[in-house]
């Protein structure tokens, strides 16, 4: 991973960046409406304040709708739903635009005016006529089908976990936790029951438990995060501070969609290939987070912030407490094991290396929320390694959380890829590249 610093400048956030994207076009403007509207979809979710796991679900809905619309016309892959019928000769480009637009406008009505402008701009590049009209109708049908399919998928209403009395190893609320009925409570409790997109059941992905508190493995992970993850650590290299800061502001959905767009352009993939790829990638990210939340609330393991302050209660003579420990970045408000970022990142990478190959790419990741940090990569493993480091050097995860998240994500990504959206005309489909 190479690290670049852009010039100092004012940070530009949220809706301002969304407006710029929609009015002036994304970096891949007019190259491929699937890629163009992927930029708009992710930016819209972020601008409207969605948290990382909600972003993942939403991106999967958009990209599966786009895939279903495009595939109803091209017929290259086995469909996700299969109920969308496209007239002969319908425009796949128009279908992609309309499918993304309709899902976006349904979920984010406050952004409708800017989405309308983006839709008009995209459709203006497509010749008028029956093909365009039929493509729009196909995209509309696909969007409505996906919206209906996910209407009662368990993602709402929000549910919270109220922690019990302090017990060594058990999760306790940290400073970021909201107050529910006067009690600081864990968020995302309902997410373990969200209907997956591409796996049958999150409970099929139950991990082995976290290391025992008295084990050498736990002590090693404890001492690492205490040393390099504290707010005032002198042992954290500047580049590890950068990745911790970057991935605190950047979800796996943001990072891996940006990477996927760049690699898809680099490899000159078709509209149909891109629609399938982005559907699979985002299905895997979303499903990995469902499975991760299932494991989190199953094991209910404490965060480093709690563990290190109470290090004299864990029964391990190798873990010295620091009652004043503060992490470098803010601890998310739910249990530690496994890492959501680690799970989602590795699920995305598992799909992407099967689609594109592991290495030899040129990927530049940036985020206007952290404008002075730009990260460059040539392989997907470099990204997942940085994300693993980011959460440990950020002080919010044990290394064992990251390792477990990686195992979970790789398993979910493999399952999503192997069981969804297969090529129609390949009787010897072999999972493309299987090199996790």
Please report, for each region that a protein language model flagged, where it lies by residue:
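Short, solvent-exposed mixed-charge patches
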Residues: 433-436
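Glycine-centered signal
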Residues: 6, 26-28
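Bacterial N-terminal signal peptides that target proteins for export
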Residues: 2-16
């Amino acid at each position: 991973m190479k690290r670049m610093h852009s010039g100092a400048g004012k940070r530009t956030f949220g809706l301002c960046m969304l407006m710029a994207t929609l009015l002036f076009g994304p970096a891949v403007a007019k190259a491929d409406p699937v890629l163009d509207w992927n930029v708009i979809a992710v930016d819209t979710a972020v601008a409207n304040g969605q948290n990382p796991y909600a972003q993942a679900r939403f991106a999967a809905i958009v990209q599966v709708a786009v895939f279903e619309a495009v595939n109803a016309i091209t017929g290259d892959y086995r469909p996700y739903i299969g109920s969308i019928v496209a007239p002969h000769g319908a425009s796949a480009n128009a279908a992609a635009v309309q499918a993304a637009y309709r899902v976006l406008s349904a979920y984010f009505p406050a952004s409708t005016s800017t989405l309308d402008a983006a839709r008009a701009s995209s459709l203006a590049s497509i010749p008028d006529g029956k093909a365009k009209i039929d493509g729009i109708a196909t995209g509309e049908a696909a969007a409505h089908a996906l919206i209906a399919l996910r209407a009662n998928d368990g993602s709402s209403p929000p549910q919270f976990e109220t922690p019990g009395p302090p017990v060594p190893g058990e999760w306790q609320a940290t400073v970021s936790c909201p107050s529910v009925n006067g009690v600081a409570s864990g968020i995302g409790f309902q997410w373990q029951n969200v209907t997956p997109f591409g796996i049958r059941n999150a409970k099929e992905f139950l991990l082995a438990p976290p290391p025992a508190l008295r084990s050498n493995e736990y002590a090693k992970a404890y001492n690492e995060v205490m040393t390099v993850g504290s707010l005032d650590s002198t042992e954290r290299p500047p580049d590890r501070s950068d990745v911790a800061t970057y991935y605190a502001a950047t979800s796996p959905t943001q990072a891996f969609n940006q990477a996927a767009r760049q690699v898809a352009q680099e490899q000159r993939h078709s509209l149909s290939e891109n629609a399938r790829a982005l559907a699979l990638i985002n299905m895997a990210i979303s499903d990995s987070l469902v499975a991760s939340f299932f494991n989190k609330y199953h094991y209910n393991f404490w965060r480093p912030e709690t563990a290190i302050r109470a290090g004299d209660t864990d029964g391990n003579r190798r873990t010295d407490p620091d009652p004043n420990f503060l992490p470098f970045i803010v601890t998310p408000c739910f249990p530690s094991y496994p890492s959501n970022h680690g799970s989602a990142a590795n699920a995305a990478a598992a799909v992407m290396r099967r689609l594109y190959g592991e290495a030899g790419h040129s990927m530049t990741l940036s985020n206007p929320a952290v404008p002075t940090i730009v990260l460059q990569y040539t392989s997907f493993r470099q990204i997942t390694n940085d994300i693993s480091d980011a959460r440990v050097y950020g002080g919010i995860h044990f290394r064992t959380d990251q390792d477990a998240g990686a195992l979970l994500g790789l398993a979910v990504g493999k399952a999503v890829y192997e069981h969804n959206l297969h090529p129609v005309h390949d009787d010897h489909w072999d999972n493309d590249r299987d090199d996790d």
